[in-house]
Amino acid sequence: MSHLRIAVTFLCTLFALTAGAGESCQVGGSAIPVGKTKQELCNLYECATDSNRVVLKKLTCAEQAVKTGCRSVPGDANAPFPDCCPTTLCRGRQWDH
């Protein structure tokens, strides 16, 4: 019985280590291997596995609701994510930047 337990443990470990091996996500004609990221304009893509499925995660700037006394300042369009995203500056804190 202990040999069976060792064999099952070995196979489960091997499967966990090879999940997603050789697989990739497609983004605009290029492939991102599982476990890697790709920077593109103001987006960051990550190819990952989730419950034995290959998934593509995309991070991009969120729209912000600007409160009274604050203003939105555009980010540098040539900067990598998240430095390309706009920031919110408010009176009394960072207004004079």
Curated annotation (Swiss-Prot):
Subcellular location: Secreted
Post-translational modification: Contains 4 disulfide bonds.
Presence of keyword Disulfide bond: yes
Main location: secreted
Keywords: Disulfide bond, Secreted, Signal, Toxin
The keyword Protein biosynthesis belongs to this UniProt entry's keyword annotation: no
Tissue expr: Expressed by the venom gland.
SMART domains xrefs: SVWC
Pfam families membership: SVWC
Endpoints of the signal sequence: 1-20
Cellular component terms (Gene Ontology): extracellular region
Gene Ontology terms for molecular function: toxin activity
Additional facts recorded: Negative results: this recombinant protein is not able to act on sodium channels (Nav).
UniProt similarity note: Belongs to the scorpion La1-like peptide family.
Protein name in the entry: Venom peptide HsVx1
Organism field: Heterometrus spinifer (Asia giant forest scorpion)
